[in-house]
């Protein structure tokens, strides 16, 4: 009733005409009904409930008004909001950000009847749960809608989306993580701009590559620490509208939002220090009998590539052959650690790039 909604619009219209607004509360309805209640689409909610349930919703009228409710609800509280408007001081309550919100004026609801099943199950919701906000039902219900909305926005902006995720601890959708198939320079920044331009509730947006599982806290943290530079990869927007209950905002509902580009720079993807250290998959046809043959034909090669080329199971024979080439002064390595044939002092491995500098020295 305090946020912009159809219900608020209908009620303020009743007040302007001096009319009461009959309302029935269904307690303990089908769990998927709450999903429909949290959606904002230009259609009747009951129609959406039927669509999500996959069958028509049985409805019955209230006993003191004509408002229909799901017949399979556990309890129905009937009544009306009086015509006097927002007149009663209400609160404070724990709000969706996990902190207490200020007291505000609300309408008065008058109960006219309560009906329930004989074996009624009273359903309740966790709301305003402080540091345990991630357990609140509303967070998870809202995230489904926000994730779908964000995905549609990005697809309409020609951005190839791998996954979209609203973390449950982000106070009802103020944080959004997105993984994309990066295809051109600046795509992460374009995604951030498109999302902030269409979703006012977002406060921080994080964009990663498709190799990161954004639902895995460890992978997401790793991408943040290894691919992000604050002076290069953070975009901030001042004076943006946001969530009015955000306690960090001091001057009304306007504040600063930020986007974080946690993607690998396209122009550096082939660099060794941009290559994730993962266990190699040793599969493929055996192409050579000796290390010398492999390096004469296909150099430079990593050790794992030599194992694949020779069909080695553990690399022991490759180590022996590399040592023989080293003793003859024929073994070289490039700055990325790949092996090749060349001229070097006997008993030593030569460095193919004499300008290479050890970053650890």
PLM regions and their residue ranges:
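Charged, compositionally biased interaction regions
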Residues: 29-297, 302-311, 315, 319-323, ...
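Minor-groove-contacting beta-hairpin "wing" of winged helix-turn-helix DNA-binding domains
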Residues: 337-343
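A short, conserved structural fragment
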Residues: 326-337
């Amino acid at each position: 009733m305090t946020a912009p909604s159809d219900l608020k619009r209908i009620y303020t219209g009743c007040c302007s005409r001096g009319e009461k607004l009959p309302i029935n509360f269904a307690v303990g309805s089908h769990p998927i009904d709450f999903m429909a209640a949290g959606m904002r689409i230009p259609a009747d909610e009951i129609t959406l409930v039927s669509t999500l349930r996959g069958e028509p919703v049985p409805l019955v009228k209230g006993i003191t008004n004509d408002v229909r409710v799901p017949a399979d609800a556990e309890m129905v509280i009937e009544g009306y909001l009086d015509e006097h408007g927002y007149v009663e001081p209400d609160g404070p309550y724990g709000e969706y950000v996990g902190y207490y919100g200020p007291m505000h004026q609300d309408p008065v609801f008058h109960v006219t009847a309560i009906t329930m099943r004989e074996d009624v199950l009273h359903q309740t919701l966790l709301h305003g749960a402080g540091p345990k906000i991630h357990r609140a039902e509303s967070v998870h219900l809202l995230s489904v809608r926000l994730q779908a909305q964000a995905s549609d926005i990005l697809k309409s902006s020609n951005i190839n989306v791998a996954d979209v995720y609203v973390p449950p601890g982000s106070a009802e959708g103020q944080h959004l993580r997105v993984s994309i198939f990066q295809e051109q320079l600046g795509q992460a920044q374009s995604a951030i701009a498109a999302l902030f331009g269409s979703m006012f509730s977002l406060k921080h947006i994080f964009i990663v590559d498709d190799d990161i599982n954004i639902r895995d806290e460890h992978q997401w943290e790793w991408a943040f620490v290894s691919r992000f530079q604050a002076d290069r990869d953070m975009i901030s927007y001042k004076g943006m509208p946001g969530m009015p209950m955000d306690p960090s905002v001091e001057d009304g509902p306007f504040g600063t939002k930020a986007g974080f580009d946690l993607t690998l720079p396209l122009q550096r993807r082939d660099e060794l220090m941009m290559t994730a250290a993962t266990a190699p998959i040793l599969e493929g046809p055996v192409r050579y009998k000796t290390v010398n043959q492999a390096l004469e034909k296909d150099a430079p090669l990593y050790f794992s590539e030599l194992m694949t080329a020779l069909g080695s199971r553990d690399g022991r024979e490759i180590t022996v052959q590399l040592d023989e080439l080293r003793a003859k002064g024929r073994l070289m390595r490039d700055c990325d650690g790949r092996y090749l044939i060349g001229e070097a002092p006997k008993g030593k491995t030569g460095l193919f790039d004499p300008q290479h500098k050890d970053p650890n020295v």
